[in-house]
Amino acid sequence: MVVRKEKKSRKYRGYRTHGWGTKGQHRDRGAQGGRQIGMHKEKWSWTVKFGEGWYGKHGFRNPTSKLVNAIGLRKLQEYIDNDKIKIEEENGKKVVDLAKYGYDKLLGGGNLRLPLVIKVAKATEKAKERVKEIGGEIILTSSE
């Protein structure tokens, strides 16, 4: 028996692009939202308003520089007071291990009120002096 069914696609027969304009226009992703246009001409108003520092040279990041996470004595005392840094007891001494809290270096700004044994990778001379003055000690954990 003959199947009576309309053709699936019978519109625009003989019309090369089926109503989608120039060849290939229906095939791609549409307009690209201004990614390909020049900021100096077509999008100048945006560049003036939001694009500060868009043009010109802007330095570089030194690849050999090492970030040091440091803490001063003033901030250390503040964190101890607020229980952000806990004091541990070892052999009857109060010990703070700064490496456990992510600090690499102890700076000498400010003062401590407690004689502490502080374990840290690096410390400034001023920090060493101030900790010794109140009866504390700094144990350097790195070999540098």
Curated annotation (Swiss-Prot):
<keyword id="KW-0689">Ribosomal protein</keyword>
<feature type="compositionally biased region" description="Basic residues">
    <location>
        <begin position="1"/>
        <end position="16"/>
    </location>
</feature>
<dbReference type="InterPro" id="IPR036227">
    <property type="entry name" value="Ribosomal_uL15/eL18_sf"/>
</dbReference>
<dbReference type="GO" id="GO:0022625">
    <property type="term" value="C:cytosolic large ribosomal subunit"/>
</dbReference>
<dbReference type="GO" id="GO:0006412">
    <property type="term" value="P:translation"/>
</dbReference>
<protein>
    <recommendedName>
        <fullName>Large ribosomal subunit protein uL15</fullName>
    </recommendedName>
</protein>
<feature type="region of interest" description="Disordered">
    <location>
        <begin position="1"/>
        <end position="35"/>
    </location>
</feature>
<comment type="similarity">
    <text>Belongs to the universal ribosomal protein uL15 family.</text>
</comment>
<keyword id="KW-0699">rRNA-binding</keyword>
<dbReference type="InterPro" id="IPR001196">
    <property type="entry name" value="Ribosomal_uL15_CS"/>
</dbReference>
<dbReference type="InterPro" id="IPR027386">
    <property type="entry name" value="Rbsml_uL15_N"/>
</dbReference>
<keyword id="KW-0687">Ribonucleoprotein</keyword>
<dbReference type="InterPro" id="IPR030878">
    <property type="entry name" value="Ribosomal_uL15"/>
</dbReference>
<dbReference type="InterPro" id="IPR021131">
    <property type="entry name" value="Ribosomal_uL15/eL18"/>
</dbReference>
<comment type="function">
    <text>Binds to the 23S rRNA.</text>
</comment>
<keyword id="KW-0694">RNA-binding</keyword>
<dbReference type="GO" id="GO:0019843">
    <property type="term" value="F:rRNA binding"/>
</dbReference>
<dbReference type="Pfam" id="PF00828">
    <property type="entry name" value="Ribosomal_L27A"/>
</dbReference>
<dbReference type="GO" id="GO:0003735">
    <property type="term" value="F:structural constituent of ribosome"/>
</dbReference>
<comment type="subunit">
    <text>Part of the 50S ribosomal subunit.</text>
</comment>
